[in-house]
Amino acid sequence: MMTLLSNGTSTDTGPDTSSDTVVPSYVLDSWWTPDTDVVAQRVLDASTGAEVARVSSDGLDLAAVVEHARTVGQASLGELTFHQRAILLKKLGQYLGGVKEELYALSARTGATRYDSMVDIDGGIGVLFTLSSKARREMPNSQVYIDGDVEALSRDGSFSGQHIYTRIPGVACQINAFNFPVWGMLEKLAPAFIAGVPTIVKPATPTGYLTEAVVRHILASGILPLGALQLISGSARDLIDHLDYRDLVAFTGSAGTARTLKSHPNVVEGGVRFTSETDSLNAAILGPDAAAGTAEFDAYVASVVTEMTSKAGQKCTSIRRLIVPAGRRDQVVAAVSERMARRVTLGDPRAEGVTMGPLASTGQRDEVLASVARLIDGGGRIVMGSVDAPTGTDPGGAFVAPILLAFHDPESPAVHEIEAFGPVASIIEYTDLDHAIVLAARGGGSLVTTVATHHPDIARTLVLGIAAHHGRVLMLDRVDARSSTGHGSPVPHLVHGGPGRAGGSEELGGIRSVLHHMQRTAIQGSPDMLTAITGEWHAGAAVRTGIHPFRKSLAELRVGDQTQGGPRVVTLADITAFAEATGDKFYAHTDPEAAAANPFFPGIVAHGYLLVSWAAGLFVDAAPGPVLANSGLEKLRFVTPVSPGDSIRVTLTAKRITPRETEEYGEVCWDAVLHNQNDEVVATYDVLTLVAKE
C-alpha cells in the first residue's frame, strides 16, 4: 500500500497570498485590478481547499492591451538585434534563478511537489538559457534571418532570389494550461522575445497566481523593454476579436477548446496564426526483447511510474497507454504496482516525504474520476489503485491515487479516445510489431511515445512505423536509461507538439520556435539590393579594395571589403611533397595511371587541402593586427581539379560581420573563391575569423 500523509498543522504553507484583492493583471506597463465590487472566481489550495486567491478581468480593455503591444512593444523590441534580445533573456534567467525558492513555496499550493516545481520553474528558466545560447550561436546579430542559399535567377548573376525571415508586426498571445504555470509561459515567451514580438500572457485560472508572481519578478528585474510583456489574470474571452493576420495565438489546453478557438472568424478568415498543443494519448511500447529482468523492462517500468505520478499525471506528455507484448501484461502490472507502492507517497506536497501531490483543483479531480468511469464503461478494469478518496488526506483537497486499468480488447475505442488527465494509464497487449504500430497510431496523433528496446531492428521498425503519428519518439534502453531526459520532458532544443489530436502544431525546437514568430519572404533583385536588405554580401555586389581587410577592426570593416592573392603555380613536386608530409597518398595524387583511369581526373591532381592551405598564404596579412584567430571553415566544395602546371588565385570578400555583444571581438565570415588560370572555379568556401572590435 502507498503511504498517505495528511496536511499537519505544523506544515509550512509557504508565503502569505492574501485573497482580499483580485490577482492583478499587468497591462499598458502598469498593474491593473478590476473594481472592488466585481464578482471574482475563487482559487483554492489544491491540498486543503483553503482560498488562495480570487481572479477576475472584468472591465479590462483588451483592445487597448493589444494596441499597446503592437505600438509600444513592437517599437521597443524593434530597436534590438537578435543577439541583444538573447542577452536580455540570459540575464532574466539568472535573475529568476535567484528568486526560485519563493516560487517553489507558492507552487506547492498548486499541488506540486518540489520535484514537480523544479520541472516547472527550473525547466522554464532553462528554456531562457538554452534559447539565448542558441540564438547567439545560430542567428546573426541583426534583425533579418536568412533562410537557405541564394538562388541564381539569371545567367549573368544580375538577378537573384533569397528567402528571409522578419518578425511578425503584431503580438504573440499565449493561452496556457493550468499544469505548468511557469514553464508554459517562459517556453512561449523566449522565442517570441528573440524574434522581437511582444507577448500577452493569459494563464489558466487555477494556477495563474503563480504566473503572476513570476511576472512580478520579471518586472522587478527591469530587464525587459516597455510593452514586451503583458499579463491578463482572468478571462480573455474576446481577445481574438482584436487580433488579425499580424498576430499569433499559441494555445495549450484541451482539444475541445482548441477547436473552438480555431473556428473564430479572425482565425478562419482573418489570418490569425494559431498553434495548439492539446491533450494526447501518449504511449509507451515495450519491445518484445524487453523481457522481465532486462534493463529495458526495468527502465520501462520506472518511466511509467514517473510519468503517472509527476505533476500527479497532469502533463500533456504523460504516458496514457502502455502497449506491451502479448503475455506480458501481468508482469508489467505487478512491476508497476510494486514500484508504485515502494516509491510513491501521496499527500500535501509541503509535508515531509510526500512524492506525489493532489490535482490542481477539485474540479480537475472530478473530471479525472469521470473519465475513469468512462474508461471502465468502455471495457477497462482497474488492476491498480482505486477511485475512492485516498484515506488520510484532507477532504478539501483534490487527491486521486494512481490508477492503472487493463483492457482485454486492445482495439477498444475507449482506451484510444478517452484521456483521464491525472495519474491514470491503461495497459493493452499487441501481437506483433505491426500490431503495436497500429495501436500506437490509434491515438489519432500524439506528442510523444517511448519505445523500450535494445534491438536496433525492432527500434527501426517501430520508429519508422509510428513517427508520422508523433511529434517526438524516445528510445529507451540500457545505454541511455540513466542519462535520458525522460518521456514526459520536452527539451527546448527539440520540437514539442504533434499531429492530429495533439494539436497539429509545434513549439520549441531551438531556432525553429523563433521562426514561428516570423514571416518568411522571398526577395528578388540585384546582388547590391539583396546585400543591402540582408546585411550579407552577395556575389556580384559592390566590393571595396585598397586597404587589406585584415588591417581593419570590426568597427572599420564592411561587408564587401575584398582582397585578392596569387597566382601560384602548382608543380608535381609540390603535390608529392604534400603527400609525403601529410601521409595522404591517395592514388589520384601519386599514381599517374590509376589517376588517369578515374572518371573525374585527367591524371595526377593536387590535393584539395593543399590548395586551401596555399590560398590562406595568398590572402593573409601576416603582421599582428585586428584579426585575432581563424575559428573555422565552412561549406568547402571542390569544383575543378588542378593538375601540375595549373595556377590558382584567391578572392576573399567580407561576407557577414557578427559583433559579439559581451566580448571585445566579433566573428567575420569571408567568402573565399579559388580560380585557375582559365578563370574556372576551383573551390569555394567560407573562412571564419575572430576580429577585434577596435
Annotate each language-model stretch with its function.
Residues 597-606, 610-651, 655-656:
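Hydrophobic beta-strand-centered segment that forms part of the acyl-chain substrate-binding groove
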Residues 39, 51-58, 74-78, 153, ...:
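Short, well-ordered beta-strand elements within core beta-sheets of diverse protein domains
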